[in-house]
Amino acid sequence: MTDGNQKPDGNSGEQVTVTDKRRIDPETGEVRHVPPGDMPGGTAAADAAHTEDKVAELTADLQRVQADFANYRKRALRDQQAAADRAKASVVSQLLGVLDDLERARKHGDLESGPLKSVADKLDSALTGLGLVAFGAEGEDFDPVLHEAVQHEGDGGQGSKPVIGTVMRQGYQLGEQVLRHALVGVVDTVVVDAAELESVDDGTAVADTAENDQADQGNSADTSGEQAESEPSGS
């Protein structure tokens, strides 16, 4: 018994489409118009353009990723160096009190010889190698960034210049970081310009010359008087 809805074996129900890709119509003999996208060369050109655009896009993405990684690496190295500097500064800061004791011993003459002198020299050499620099000496210009004034002599008037007169405690600097300010006493000194100093020197020289001339004239007068007294009278 056969189902009425069942199609014969010869008819599968699929439609077969046949495309005539001949450029010349066999019936009319005319050249058929083919769209650019349907031409064999047009498809290859479009694929090549698309590939170039994709390569350019991926290249730009790669360059951005490389730039981001380079910036990240720089930041990581900078942060690592900053952490190392902070750790080094923390350790060195704890040794500043030892340096103060050694400085007092040096002023008392206790470091002229002996094992303590060797220890002090080695410690100074090691800290200097790390970049530790001491500052604050008598006669230096006062710098509020480096020095802390606990005494001040002078009125600080116009033309005066503050200099360090007394050092109570040395300051220390590690690289560009100030570990401890120097405690100093400040003295105001008068600044004299070179031209003003030269004019003062010239005036002093003129005054000295005038005094010498007056002294010479006085000596000449005394000599003439003595000669007149020593001559016999004519009577």
Curated annotation (Swiss-Prot):
Coarse class of the protein's main subcellular location: cytoplasm
Annotated region described as Disordered, given as residue ranges: 1-50, 198-235
UniProt-listed GO biological process terms: cellular response to starvation; protein folding
InterPro entries in alphabetical order: GrpE, GrpE_coiled_coil, GrpE_head
Localization terms from the record: Cytoplasm
Composition bias, Basic and acidic residues: 19-35
An example Gene Ontology CC term for this record: cytoplasm
Compositional bias segments (type: Polar residues): 1-18, 215-235
Residues found modified as N-acetylthreonine: 2
Key words, A-Z: Acetylation, Chaperone, Cytoplasm, Stress response
Presence of keyword Transmembrane helix: no
Keyword Cytoplasm found: yes
One annotated GO molecular function: protein-folding chaperone binding
Gene3D superfamilies in UniProt: 3.90.20.20, Head domain of nucleotide exchange factor GrpE
Role: Participates actively in the response to hyperosmotic and heat shock by preventing the aggregation of stress-denatured proteins, in association with DnaK and GrpE. It is the nucleotide exchange factor for DnaK and may function as a thermosensor. Unfolded proteins bind initially to DnaJ; upon interaction with the DnaJ-bound protein, DnaK hydrolyzes its bound ATP, resulting in the formation of a stable complex. GrpE releases ADP from DnaK; ATP binding to DnaK triggers the release of the substrate protein, thus completing the reaction cycle.
Family: Belongs to the GrpE family.
Miscellaneous field: Was identified as a high-confidence drug target.
Oligomer and partners: Homodimer.
Name of this chain's protein: Protein GrpE
Organism: Mycobacterium tuberculosis (strain ATCC 25618 / H37Rv)
Recorded name of the encoding gene: grpE
